[in-house]
Amino acid sequence: MSDKSNIATLDSTLIDRLPSSSKTLFEAKATKSLTFESIAQELGRSEVAVAALFYGQAQASAADIEKLSQILEVPQSKLEAELGGFPDRGRAGPMPPVEPLIYRLYEIVQNYGYAYKAVLNEKFGDGIMSAISFSTKVEKEVDEQGNNWAVITLRGKWLPFSRF
């Protein structure tokens, strides 16, 4: 359990654009005062991946559904019905850029943006990551099979919103 002020909840303005599973998952998460990190530890997944599940931007495996049912105390049959299909990603976003690489970066933000926001808010509170006090790096990795992987690191100063 965690401090309720650090628990990411579902923005009600998004409900109509998200799958029904989002409301189910977020309500149970809030009721149990769980963070994405604590749920991720139980699922054996990253917290961003778990947040993406909650926003309907990632596919849940049968094992994910079974474990989420236990953690959140939501009937497994309900989660199977709501999470059993393929995700309908990126529905809330505007028309994307057309340049292929930029489009892929935009696609990452579409698919994981709300998940990142939720996890960042849980870790830092209400605020934004600066794109001015900011650094990024791109690295190339080659795996054991010889496949190339792009590694993009984003590092931004956390700027809390001011109360006025």
UniProtKB/Swiss-Prot annotation:
SUPFAM superfamilies: Cyanase C-terminal domain, lambda repressor-like DNA-binding domains. Its EC number is 4.2.1.104. Gene3D superfamilies: Cyanate lyase, C-terminal domain, lambda repressor-like DNA-binding domains. GO terms for molecular function: cyanate hydratase activity; DNA binding. Pfam families: Cyanate_lyase (PF02560). GO terms for biological process: cyanate metabolic process. The active site is at R104, E107, S130. InterPro entries: Cyanase, Cyanate_lyase_C, Cyanate_lyase_C_sf, Lambda_DNA-bd_dom_sf. Catalyzes the reaction of cyanate with bicarbonate to produce ammonia and carbon dioxide. Belongs to the cyanase family. This is Cyanate hydratase.
